Amino acid sequence: MLQPKQTSWVILAGGQARRMGGKDKGFVLFQDKALIEHALDTLTSQTDQIAINANRSIEEYSRYAVTFPDQFSEYPGPLAGMHSGLVNMNSDWVGFIPCDSPNLPNNLVSLLCNAVKEDTDIVVAHDGEYMQPVVTLMHKRIIPKIDAFLTRGDRKIILLYKECNTVFADFSDYPNAFINLNSPQELEQFGTLL
């Protein structure tokens, strides 16, 4: 069984944050703390190999953890951040969480690790109703597939998952875990829920 200490983790903070008015989402405050700090708190209780993928504010993010940008230009989405994480991290298994989901559970790493089988390429969180495509654990052997996928202009993570041996980790006991804060309205709306 894959152990959490055999994995490394990347917080995805490389987006353009258009719905947040272009403000770097990782530094948006939620409950008096930057979203990047919520993400770090989630992971530091579970693992010690943590990095950040960002395409701006790299110096600021570097104060929190090792930070690296996408290797593909023009913001091709979270898949580019995943590619960069797989290339830059040392472990065979690399996990990813978004910077804008401050309610992820403290056992996220072990739940994803427990779903890994011998031939698994990717584990994706599933909340009982929906797949959560950017809360995932990937094996480095898929780097060539992601590279080819992005090079040909594909961006939809779900299509990549169909090309790989993808399994799901059950997070149905955590119905509010995957709330995403993409806009000022969502920050306000979910501030009392979490």
From Swiss-Prot:
Catalytic activity: Mo-molybdopterin + GTP + H(+) = Mo-molybdopterin guanine dinucleotide + diphosphate
Residues given in the record as Mg(2+) binding sites: 100
Entry keyword annotation includes Nucleotide-binding: yes
Superkingdom field: Bacteria
GO BP terms, alphabetized: bis(molybdopterin guanine dinucleotide)molybdenum biosynthetic process
Binding-site positions, GTP: 12-14, 25, 53, 70, 100
Enzyme type, top EC level: transferase
Subcellular location: Cytoplasm
Enzyme Commission identifier(s): 2.7.7.77
Cofactor(s) the protein requires to work: Mg(2+)
One GO cellular component, as annotated: cytoplasm
A GO MF label: molybdenum cofactor guanylyltransferase activity
Pfam families in the record: NTP_transf_3
Keyword line: Cytoplasm, GTP-binding, Magnesium, Metal-binding, Molybdenum cofactor biosynthesis, Nucleotide-binding, Transferase
InterPro entries listed in its UniProt record: MobA-like_NTP_Trfase, Molybde_CF_guanTrfase, Nucleotide-diphossugar_trans
Entry comment, domain topic: The N-terminal domain determines nucleotide recognition and specific binding, while the C-terminal domain determines the specific binding to the target protein.
Assembly behavior: Monomer.
Function: Transfers a GMP moiety from GTP to Mo-molybdopterin (Mo-MPT) cofactor (Moco or molybdenum cofactor) to form Mo-molybdopterin guanine dinucleotide (Mo-MGD) cofactor.
NCBIfam families, A to Z: molyb_mobA
HAMAP family the UniProt entry points to: MobA (MF_00316)
Official protein name in the record: Molybdenum cofactor guanylyltransferase
